[in-house]
Amino acid sequence: MFIIELIKGIILGVVEGLTEFAPVSSTGHMILVDDMWLKSSEFLGSQSAFTFKIVIQLGSVFAAAWVFRERFLEILHIGKHKHVEGENDQQRRSKPRRLNLLHVLVGMVPAGILGLLFDDFIEEHLFSVPTVMIGLFVGAIYMIIADKYSVKVKNPQTVDQINYFQAFVIGISQAVAMWPGFSRSGSTISTGVLMKLNHKAASDFTFIMAVPIMLAASGLSLLKHYQDIQIADIPFYILGFLAAFTVGLIAIKTFLHLSNKIKLIPFAIYRIVLVIFIAILYFGFGIGKGI
């Protein structure tokens, strides 16, 4: 039985790693795979299962941090990315504009404020199957609109051409994506495209902006719930974390490689199909009614 539970932990880590940064909603997939199928709460307990989801999310976040480690070092002016010794202000200003720490902070502000004000409310009232289906569907429509608009944009911007206003607006869309199922990456990439970024630039900024705020949010949640972790369940947590981290590395690199080629509409169609599938299970067969 213990082996079966470990396998379930690995499966959940894989699902988290595949979906956390893809524009398909990790929440929707965790409801489908865990709450409707594997039911980790039955062998971990509801509180410990919630903490497990925080841990595997951290695995995905660390994967994104690793993929973008060079960019983060550059943003923080660490190591070889710091200013050249003796370089004057005029020389610095003459360099091409680069994404900097202020862009990231400006993008984080809306979600940070909303999270501090409404995190408990969202956790208690919006994590139901119907609300997640709404988020999945509305987010899919938004992605389709963004992709249709992007066809009309000539010479879309790169990530280093983002200005502070664009960063703030994309940050607002990250705050909107706190509605479960809407998808953080789906929302922010769509908004970035609507703000005349190319898909790769919007994806890059989405991940760069998401890492610090998700680390902070998941870290705080883990501090609040760490006492729910049982010693006997630690192998379950470790395997789930490692699965999410490993699969997350592969998924993020693959998505970034394909982001300018396959766009958002295929993901939007997939989300609509997912909504229909979950709706059939929920309304037709009563699966997940207790969620």
From Swiss-Prot:
Protein name: Undecaprenyl-diphosphatase
Reactions catalysed: di-trans,octa-cis-undecaprenyl diphosphate + H2O = di-trans,octa-cis-undecaprenyl phosphate + phosphate + H(+)
Domain of life where this protein originates: Bacteria
Residues in coiled coil: none
Source organism of this protein record: Staphylococcus aureus
Function of the protein: Catalyzes the dephosphorylation of undecaprenyl diphosphate (UPP). Confers resistance to bacitracin. Is also required for virulence.
Transmembrane segments: 1-21, 48-68, 102-122, 126-146, 162-182, 203-223, 231-251, 267-287
GO molecular function: undecaprenyl-diphosphatase activity
GO cellular component, one term: plasma membrane
BP GO annotations: cell wall organization; peptidoglycan biosynthetic process; regulation of cell shape; response to antibiotic
InterPro entries hit by this protein: UppP
Gene that this polypeptide is encoded by: uppP
Xref: Pfam families: BacA (PF02673)
Topology versus the membrane: Multi-pass membrane protein
Cellular compartment(s): Cell membrane
Keywords: Antibiotic resistance, Cell membrane, Cell shape, Cell wall biogenesis/degradation, Hydrolase, Membrane, Peptidoglycan synthesis, Transmembrane, Transmembrane helix
Enzyme Commission code: 3.6.1.27
Keyword Chaperone: no
Family assignment from sequence similarity: Belongs to the UppP family.
Note: Bacitracin is thought to be involved in the inhibition of peptidoglycan synthesis by sequestering undecaprenyl diphosphate, thereby reducing the pool of lipid carrier available.
